Amino acid sequence: MPHPDTTSDKPHKCAGSPLKRCLGKGVLAVGVCMLASAGFVLHQSKAYGLLERIHHGLIICTPGTGLSMTAASAGLARQSSPAMLRLELASQEDGRVIVMPGSSQLSDVLASSRRAHTLLMLDLNNTNPADVAALVRKARMLDRVVLVSSSRETTETALQADPDLLVAIPIHSVRDAYAAHRMAGTHPYAAYLSPTASPNLFTLVHRDAEAIITENPATPALSTEEFLADRPVDIVVTPQPAQLTQALAGGS
């Protein structure tokens, strides 16, 4: 029988090594869980992005305000199409960007929109595109916003404001389509077409633009379903989103 003193240290050695291994495995497991959680959060965030939601179907956009945003987005959320609101922006004398009508600050509206997973189409009007882009980036809404301008100069400024922010470029002809492609360069852009544009023009701009925006055709001669069947459209702007959704559901 071995002397007790000769074996007294052995249990400590045997117990210590598995303990270290267990601790190491525990740390590794925690790290894996954290990475998995981060990946899940990132995936969920991307799922709410504009371009990702375009792949899942037509996006219906309706005019809204900073004050009515919550109610409007809640109403759209009950419909089959993703919710998108078109907001008019303005600059105050103190430099703050607000949503009209009303005086809601764009920063607050962006924060609310992110929580509600609401997409936004922002009309720049007289605002500085760089200021708007900075607010959008700070709110982590770059992938959920598209900027709209009525002038070429403001459009060019918006394209330079942030390389990751989608900018809508008005296109009325084949010449405009090629000019928009040259203007944007490597910057992602959306093409904003009139509903009276030809199906061929829609098809042409679809080759280069990240998204195609148009308005609901107000003509009894052509149903919305027929209109969309001949044109690649990603976003339809309409003041009557419920009627448009019902029309599309009735035709399917």
Label the predicted regions:
Residues P2-S252:
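Phosphate-group recognition and catalysis centered on beta-loop-alpha active-site segments
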